[in-house]
C-alpha cells in the first residue's frame, strides 16, 4: 500500500501545479508558526504519528484528487484545529527533531506549492538525507528557503512571493536607470549652458571712461596729419587772440547775452559784403566801413567763410569741392553775396522774393542761426565790465600742447 501511495504522488503534484492555490503569503506564515510550535511540543514523547495520519484528510485518494486541488483551504483549516501534527510540510519536518518520519508524510499539500515545487524523486532523496541527519541541529526556515531557491529551476518559481520580489527588483532597476539618465541630462545642460567655456570666450565688463581723451584719439586716427589740420583750423583764432592782446581791441561774433565768443574775428575773416576784415577801416566800435570802392557796407558783419565754421566738415572730403568757392547761403538757395549788404539784407537775385537773409545753417559753437548773432568790437574796459575773458585768458587754451 505504501508503494502504491508513493507511485500516486506525482499525479498529485501535477494536479497541484495545474491548479495553484490563491492563498495569501501572510496567512501561510501564520500557519507555519502554529505548525512549528505544534511540532516542538510533542517532540519529547515519541508517539507514532501513523494513527493520526490515517485520519488526516491531507492524504488524498485518487477519487478525491480533483476536489482537494480545487478546495485546499477547506481541508486545511480543520486539520490545523483538530490535529496540529497532521500537516507535515517539508519545512516543518526539517525543523522538528523527530527521528523516524514515515513516507506517508512526504506528500506535499497544495499550500506548500507557494514556496517550492519538487518532483517525487527529489522528495525521496531529501527524506533519506533527513533521516540520516535527524540528530543534527535543525536548519532555520530562512536557510531552507535559500537552499531550495538555489536548487530549483527558474520556471518553478511561480508563487506570488517570487513574483513580488521580481517586480520590486525590476522597479529598482528602472528607477536607477531613470536617475542615471537625469544625471546625464543635467550634465549635458550644464555644458550647453556655458558655451563660453567650450568656445574659449571670456566676458569682460565695460566701464565708461573717467575722462575724455579726444586729443589722443584724434592723434591716433590721423597720426601726423592731426597737428597740421588742427593748426589750419584754429590758426585764425590764435592770430585774432594775439592781436587782441597787443591792440586791446577784442573782435568777436556771438549772441548778445553770451559771455564768450563763438568765433574770434581776425584779418582773414569775411564780412557779409564779401570782403575781408583787413579791407575794412576800424574807426570805432560802431563804425567799421568797407574801404573797397563802390561798396556800400558801413559796418563789418561777420559771415562764415569756411564749411568747418558751420559744422559741415565732410565737404572737404569731396573730390569736386572748392574751399575758395564756398559761400554761406540763404534759405532761398542764394549766397550772401547776392543779398544786400545793408539793412535786413534782402535778396537781389532777379525773380527772388526773399526779403531778408535767413541762414540755412547753424553755428558750429552754439547751434543757433546766423541772424541771432552779432559782431562786437570790445575794448578791455567793456570786456571787464561784461565779465568776459580778456588778456592772456583768451589765449590760455592755445598754449596746451597738441
Curated annotation (Swiss-Prot):
Disulfide feature: none
Biased composition (Basic and acidic residues): 1-35
Superkingdom of the organism of origin: Eukaryota
Chain segments carrying region Disordered: 1-205, 378-402
Pfam families: FAM221
InterPro entries reported in the protein's UniProt record: Fam221a/b
Family (UniProt): Belongs to the FAM221 family.
UniProt name for this protein: Protein FAM221B
Native species: Homo sapiens
Amino acid at each position: 500500500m505504501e508503494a502504491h501511495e508513493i507511485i500516486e504522488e506525482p499525479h498529485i503534484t501535477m494536479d497541484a501545479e495545474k491548479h495553484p492555490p490563491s492563498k495569501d503569503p501572510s496567512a501561510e506564515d501564520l500557519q507555519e508558526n502554529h505548525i512549528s510550535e505544534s511540532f516542538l511540543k510533542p517532540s519529547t514523547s515519541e508517539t507514532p504519528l501513523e494513527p493520526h495520519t490515517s485520519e488526516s484528510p491531507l492524504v488524498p485518494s485518487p477519487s478525491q484528487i480533483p476536489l482537494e486541488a480545487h478546495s485546499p483551504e477547506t481541508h486545511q483549516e480543520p486539520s490545523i484545529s483538530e490535529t496540529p501534527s497532521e500537516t507535515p510540510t517539508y519545512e516543518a519536518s526539517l525543523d522538528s527533531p523527530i527521528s523516524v518520519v514515515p513516507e506517508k508524510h512526504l506528500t506535499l499539500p497544495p499550500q506548500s506549492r507557494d514556496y517550492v515545487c519538487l518532483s517525487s524523486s527529489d522528495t525521496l532523496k531529501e527524506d533519506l538525507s533527513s533521516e540520516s541527519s535527524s540528530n543534527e541541529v535543525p536548519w532555520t526556515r530562512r536557510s531552507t528557503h535559500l537552499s531550495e531557491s538555489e536548487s530549483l529551476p527558474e520556471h518553478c518559481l511561480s508563487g506570488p512571493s517570487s513574483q513580488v520580489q521580481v517586480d520590486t527588483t525590476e522597479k529598482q532597476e528602472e528607477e536607477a536607470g531613470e536617475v542615471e539618465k537625469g544625471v546625464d541630462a543635467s550634465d549635458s545642460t550644464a555644458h550647453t549652458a556655458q558655451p563660453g567655456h567650450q568656445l574659449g570666450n571670456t566676458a569682460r565688463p565695460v566701464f565708461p571712461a573717467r575722462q575724455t581723451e579726444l586729443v589722443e584719439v584724434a592723434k591716433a586716427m590721423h597720426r601726423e596729419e592731426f597737428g597740421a589740420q588742427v593748426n589750419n583750423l584754429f590758426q585764425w583764432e590764435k592770430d585774432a587772440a594775439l592781436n587782441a592782446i597787443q591792440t586791446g581791441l577784442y573782435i568777436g561774433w556771438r549772441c548778445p547775452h553770451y559771455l564768450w565768443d563763438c568765433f574770434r574775428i581776425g584779418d582773414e575773416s569775411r564780412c557779409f559784403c564779401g570782403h575781408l576784415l583787413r579791407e575794412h577801416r576800424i574807426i570805432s566800435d560802431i563804425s567799421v566801413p568797407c574801404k573797397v570802392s563802390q561798396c556800400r557796407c558801413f559796418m563789418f558783419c561777420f559771415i562764415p567763410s569756411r564749411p568747418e565754421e558751420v559744422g559741415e566738415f565732410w565737404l572737404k572730403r569731396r573730390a569736386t569741392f572748392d574751399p575758395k568757392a564756398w559761400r554761406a547761403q540763404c534759405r532761398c538757395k542764394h549766397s550772401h553775396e547776392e543779398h544786400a549788404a545793408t539793412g535786413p539784407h534782402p535778396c537781389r537775385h532777379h525773380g527772388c522774393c526773399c526779403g531778408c537773409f535767413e541762414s540755412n545753417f547753424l553755428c558750429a559753437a552754439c547751434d543757433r542761426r546766423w541772424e541771432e548773432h552779432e559782431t562786437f568790437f570790445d575794448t578791455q574796459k567793456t570786456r571787464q565790465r561784461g565779465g568776459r575773458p580778456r588778456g592772456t585768458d583768451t589765449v590760455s587754451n592755445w598754449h596746451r600742447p597738441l
